[in-house]
């Protein structure tokens, strides 16, 4: 039994060393690209897309190290898992730097950023978003349900929802992408469907966070803001019935928020 444990530790050390070498290479490459962006902003948006993709891969490497500790050492290494969680923010930030973090805004307000990645096809954008979404889900699943980070994951998922929407060229999509004969029609539909699902989840989770944990009105406002963003996506998709349904939900939530605000004011007096 002791020999088996010793063998597992040796294998763990060897495999971790291999992963660490790749991790260090990625981190070095990240710093090199950031230095290039600082010196010359030409093509910066494409460079940030590369960085976002690299950081998704980096997250999976930390997850692989974490699984090694579970399989070979029989325990969860929270430090490694925390590195994966912290790394998740990086691809989101790099995407925000390109397409902004605007939750509910006319496309014209962030169109300039989207135009900087015009050579990236809708299929490539959707693939990147799906990879990021998978990495987020894997990290959340690795922590399990009873984690202290449960409520902070809401912010990660919400920010992910925003870049998933903003990376789309909604102007082009509204003009040609919703044509069933368009080349990327299926991809556009699947991407929009994912965005609507993510925005609905973000709104519900912020409302849940407000009701159960914080009682902070800013969480309620965020919930409503995501509903407003969801309504805008339905409008782009020409889904009039869904627009009206979300409008009614917004009105109900706003009414509840106003009542809660009045109650808070009364309690202060």
Task: Please annotate each region the language model reported.
Residues 46-74, 89-211:
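Amphipathic alpha-helical repeat scaffolds of TPR domains
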Residues 40-45, 206-215, 260:
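Helix-loop junctions that connect tandem helical modules in alpha-solenoid scaffolds
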Residues 66, 92, 196, 203, ...:
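Heptad-repeat amphipathic alpha-helical coiled-coil interaction surface used
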């Amino acid at each position: 039994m002791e020999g088996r444990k010793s063998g597992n530790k040796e294998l763990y050390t060897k495999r971790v060393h291999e992963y660490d070498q790749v991790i260090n290479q990625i981190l070095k490459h990240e710093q090199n690209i950031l230095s290039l962006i600082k010196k010359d902003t030409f093509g910066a948006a494409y460079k940030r897309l590369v960085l976002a993709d690299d950081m998704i891969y980096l997250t999976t490497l930390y997850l692989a190290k974490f699984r090694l500790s579970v399989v070979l050492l029989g325990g969860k290494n929270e430090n490694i898992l925390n590195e994966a969680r912290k790394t998740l923010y990086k691809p989101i930030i790099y995407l925000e730097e390109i397409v902004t973090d605007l939750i509910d805004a006319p496309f014209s307000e962030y169109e300039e950023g989207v135009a900087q990645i015009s050579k990236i096809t809708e299929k490539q954008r959707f693939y990147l978003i799906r990879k990021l979404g998978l990495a987020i889900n894997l990290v959340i699943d690795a922590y399990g349900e009873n984690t202290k980070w449960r409520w902070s994951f809401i912010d990660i998922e919400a920010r992910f929802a925003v870049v998933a929407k903003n990376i789309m060229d909604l102007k082009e999509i509204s003009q040609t992408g919703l044509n069933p004969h368009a080349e990327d029609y299926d991809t556009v539909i699947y991407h929009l469907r994912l965005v609507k699902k993510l925005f609905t989840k973000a709104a519900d989770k912020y409302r849940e966070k407000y009701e159960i944990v914080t009682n902070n009105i800013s969480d309620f406002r965020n919930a409503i803001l995501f509903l407003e963003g969801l309504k805008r996506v339905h409008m782009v998709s020409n889904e009039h019935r869904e627009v009206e349904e979300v409008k009614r939900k917004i009105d109900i939530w706003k009414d509840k928020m106003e009542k809660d605000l009045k109650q808070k004011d009364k309690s202060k007096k």
